[in-house]
């Protein structure tokens, strides 16, 4: 189980280090999505720090807000963004691993990620690492 308190603390610390603030936390409570979001504003940007509910993996993406229950299932993959200053600040928080947009937009190698359910891989057929780690699969 991922400690949500540590995630919240990391988001606040990273936002402060960038001269910004946390707008809100969007915590997943149902089957989907398989990630939580900490939405941060800094400068003229809004981004989401996303935390996989199954692993201690963090990434930075465009914030995602489904507007209806149907959209959750049709929302597609996250759009990961380059934010080197945030990635560097996130990497300082022990207990989490941080992946960059380049990592997540790269091809998915199932052999390198044995903790991801093989049935899900076979059914959903993720093309990128980001699709495999951060998704709306049920």
Give the positions of each predicted feature:
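Intrinsically disordered, low-complexity regulatory segments
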Residues: 1-111
């Amino acid at each position: 189980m991922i400690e949500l308190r540590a995630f919240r603390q990391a988001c606040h610390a990273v936002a402060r280090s960038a001269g910004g603030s946390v707008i809100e936390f969007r915590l997943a409570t149902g089957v989907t999505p398989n990630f939580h979001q900490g939405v941060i504003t800094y400068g003229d940007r809004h981004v989401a720090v996303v935390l996989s509910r199954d692993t201690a993996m963090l990434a930075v993406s465009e914030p995602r807000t489904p507007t209806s229950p149907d959209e959750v299932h049709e929302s597609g993959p996250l759009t990961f963004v380059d934010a080197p200053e945030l990635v560097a600040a996130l990497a300082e928080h022990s207990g989490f691993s941080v992946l960059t947009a380049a990592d997540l937009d790269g091809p998915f190698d199932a052999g390198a990620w044995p903790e991801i359910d093989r049935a899900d891989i076979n059914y959903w057929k993720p093309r990128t690492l980001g699709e495999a780690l951060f998704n709306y699969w049920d």
